[in-house]
């Protein structure tokens, strides 16, 4: 690793003219100077990686190191270096979005060693190149969106390309490295990353400790505007809060009071503009004897907006907002997107209207958080994958008690647990969840994915402060045995940048319900903090605390302005239901763009949201990797842009589960993964003006 220095903006005056005169013989003095975009705050950190000891894709770990179950460590666990944190972040984030098991496909269908044609030819897969790191801000010092550009040594300045890799979830800046960054680097493209203004920013309130752009720690006061995130709380309020609620944490997505999701499209465009600046710095003509000029202007570089989940939604939003030609095309997987639906839009499956579609996340996530623990008790869901560290008896008790409380509140019908659970599941179906995702209702709640999302997004959509303890929830360290809030044996802050995902529970920081001292929300009451879950639901249903306006601010119009685009999503997705995301987006796109649309949609049967879960018993036998099709979609788009090959039409891809014994499914083969067809026949998805009809 070689530090090339810190780029900086300089106020040029009379000295510029003098330098220009002196340097005229060394370059083109008439060329336009490459100027750092005005939204870049402070300095740009530039680092070169040799592709051996360290690299862009694997942080020096290679294919083998990424697959290691043991995380890379720190020489000093209490004060890791920025290089150690970067290595841990790449290891953690790469593994978070793909199946890392050999039987599941790692090292055979994807991985640093697998080339763009799917062959094992790249060895350890280390990629040399240069990184540019900076904040984007509005001048307040409170936005501080992390931007990162990776330029591989294989980049061809005569055939330039950029791929965005906006972070998935609320992850840090490397949050889409395996989902989009890897493909781009292998293609020789620059990668434009950003953390969407969430970025896993954590503030340990008791010690007033925050993270900086590289994950190293600082006192919040001393860090000032260099902090990735500092809670907006006065010193007096902070002291009072710490006294009453010790061992608590603020997180940027939940507690920035900025509703960052409304800016995801804009910051993705900024990441592309920053990538243009970086490429001009590397490959632009030299002027003034030293400075670089502009070689590439908006629209000159083939640019694919790509990512998954929240990053996929951000990519779609960016393409909609692009009015300068920054983005050429879009390829996204399982996008979390909130669509502003026209009243005449219709989603059909097998010719019949689906019961509900186009709901925003604030609606379906709070409903799922309320009902899923009860629905999971249904006998029809017996054998669902178990994704919890709690004893099975504890989990079953939670499910029974949640059903009983829901029934007492009149929210489900039935005189016994089974009838109540059946009603809860029926309500989820009526709300647009597919029966294909039934067996995932339990693991989505048991893993705490849904509770975490419900709490974080409710805070964001109401612009709540950490001291508000919205719906009596907060984030805290807990006693591992009892779940009661307690001081940690060692602060989680040194590693939060490396292993955190930005949405507690994460990195040893848990989601707690404030019953007295506070307890893990699953254990705080027999019904798993039902009162808090109901409160979150009522924020949406009763339109409280500004939630409707803030949700409206994140909606998109599904107008991609004629850009070619591919959406891929698994039919069994129980985190971001396909009826509310991809299907709804395609239907609305038919109104917003009509005949101009170049959008195609591939729906993958037996595909769900978290490929990282595919090695879990019961996931391995039932579900296939959606990531595989995301990569195929990127290849299809590349051939379309470079060779004019037509994109295969919208279709259902009928995959074949691996089967076998849970936890010991046979190895994934190409027989499980049929190709995307140029002539899908009966599997074709019909689209029209405001309509989509997906074959059953």
Swiss-Prot record:
A Pfam cross-reference name: 3HBOH
Q: Which keywords appear in this protein's UniProt record, sorted alphabetically?
A: Hydrolase, Secreted, Signal
Name the domain of life. Answer: Bacteria
Q: In which pathway does it act?
A: Lipid metabolism; butanoate metabolism
- What is the E.C. number? 3.1.1.22
Q: Which GO terms describe its biological process?
A: butyrate metabolic process
The cellular component terms of Gene Ontology attached to this UniProt record, alphabetical and capped at eight, are: extracellular space
Q: What does this protein do?
A: Participates in the degradation of poly-3-hydroxybutyrate (PHB). It works downstream of poly(3-hydroxybutyrate) depolymerase, hydrolyzing D(-)-3-hydroxybutyrate oligomers of various length (3HB-oligomers) into 3HB-monomers.
Q: What is this protein called?
A: D-(-)-3-hydroxybutyrate oligomer hydrolase
